[in-house]
Amino acid sequence: MSNKGQLLQDPFLNALRKEHVPVSIYLVNGIKLQGNIESFDQYVVLLRNTVTQMVYKHAISTVVPARAVNFRVDEASDA
């Protein structure tokens, strides 16, 4: 994954994790998962509901927070 992609993903996912915002994650096959982001890295997201699921990022289509989230992206980027 490009560094520019990480510049957007990391602050967004980290804000969702820190603020314990419930999310709906839609997979590329149409399945909807719901829960809270427990952790993430370059390749996976740990999603917690009644159990913790490891979801591979390449399978994720969309992440939809239950409420608006403010997150900061580096001002130095050209995004």
Curated annotation (Swiss-Prot):
One Gene Ontology biological process: regulation of RNA stability
Claim: RNA-binding is one of the keywords in the record: yes
Taxonomic lineage: Bacteria, Pseudomonadati, Pseudomonadota, Betaproteobacteria, Burkholderiales
UniProt GO molecular function: RNA binding
The Sm domain, residue ranges: 10-69
Entries under HAMAP family matching the protein: Hfq
InterPro entries: Hfq, LSM_dom_sf, Sm
Family to which this protein belongs: Belongs to the Hfq family.
Alphabetical list of Gene3D superfamilies matching this protein: 2.30.30.100
NCBIfam families: Hfq, PRK00395.1
SUPFAM superfamilies (UniProt xref): Sm-like ribonucleoproteins
Origin species: Ralstonia nicotianae (strain ATCC BAA-1114 / GMI1000) (Ralstonia solanacearum)
PANTHER family cross-referenced by the UniProt entry: RNA-BINDING PROTEIN HFQ (PTHR34772:SF1)
Protein's UniProt name: RNA-binding protein Hfq
Assembly with partners or alone: Homohexamer.
Pfam families: Hfq
Cellular compartments per GO CC: cytosol
Keywords, in A-Z order: RNA-binding, Stress response
Biological role: RNA chaperone that binds small regulatory RNA (sRNAs) and mRNAs to facilitate mRNA translational regulation in response to envelope stress, environmental stress and changes in metabolite concentrations. Also binds with high specificity to tRNAs.
